[in-house]
Amino acid sequence: MTDIRITGIPKEAGFGDYVALLKPRVMSLVVFTALVGLLVAPVTVHPMIALTGILFIALGAGASGALNMWWDEDIDRVMKRTRNRPVPSGTVAPGEALGIGLALSGIAVVMLGLATNLFAAGLLAFTIFFYAVVYSMWLKRTTPQNIVIGGAAGAFPPMIGWAVATGGVSVESLFMFALIFMWTPPHFWSLALFMKSDYSDAGVPMLTVTHGRRVTRAHVLVYSLLLAPLAVAGAFTGIGGPLYLATALALNGWLLVGAVRIWRRDEAQAEADRYRVEKGFFRFSLYYLFLHFGAILAEAALKPYGLGGW
């Protein structure tokens, strides 16, 4: 008897595939920074409003992820890092991803406006548009400054959280925006240093592809030098304090040490050890952002006991 095997037929999408479509790792950062923005605002927010606000912000983040995955299907199919995502792997159809993204976008924006306020909903709508259209459809494929300008999309969540609580913006919410905005380039350029071939194969004009690794290393250092004083200065805003200052000094000292190491690295050495330093800097940058926002949250938690703030 002949053994007939049928290959190339995509498996039916399951619950986990639809969760992956929403980019849960990115969503976790969005939820955390938005939650910090909401909780440290100088007003009392009803727990139900806070819960629903964060829920719809998370939904908006997931919608952005689905729209991005729909548009980037051709790129994601080529890149090793992304080829197993639901859309490029064929598990979820592109049209289905588009429909889910649009539906969740509408639900998230409308419900956030009804549950909290129109300003917060407007910020969320702009964030989804900026990420899905300005970044994904335009910047990502046209300029090596894609993540510099596009980084604004990931920087809005704490502002949205603050707006849920207060209905507006402030120096503090703008600082949280700026912290993420300035953090984004060194974070993603360190990734691009050891993923250059992926971006090159997909035709994405990352800085490593258009200008080479040596220029990218210099940019990591320059943006780290700009980020460090900004991060430390946050200690002297209304959401800062001695705990945040100590945390920021330690983290930014380590950031600068790492950035200098990356800048001074010889390419032959980096290839020989498979970009060990660059991968370490990339992982550290994730902890860097979470710990800064954790310190901001800790300052707010300590204030009722007379321990937080100055």
Swiss-Prot record:
Its EC number is 2.5.1.141. GO terms for molecular function: protoheme IX farnesyltransferase activity. The chain crosses the membrane at residues 26-45, 49-71, 95-115, 118-138, 147-167, 174-194, 220-240, 243-263, 289-309. Pfam families: UbiA. It is found in: Cell inner membrane. It is a multi-pass membrane protein. GO terms for cellular component: plasma membrane. Its main location: membrane. Keywords: Cell inner membrane, Cell membrane, Heme biosynthesis, Membrane, Transferase, Transmembrane, Transmembrane helix. Interacts with CtaA. Converts heme B (protoheme IX) to heme O by substitution of the vinyl group on carbon 2 of heme B porphyrin ring with a hydroxyethyl farnesyl side group. HAMAP family: CyoE_CtaB. Belongs to the UbiA prenyltransferase family. Protoheme IX farnesyltransferase subfamily. This is Protoheme IX farnesyltransferase. It comes from Cereibacter sphaeroides (strain ATCC 17023 / DSM 158 / JCM 6121 / CCUG 31486 / LMG 2827 / NBRC 12203 / NCIMB 8253 / ATH 2.4.1.).
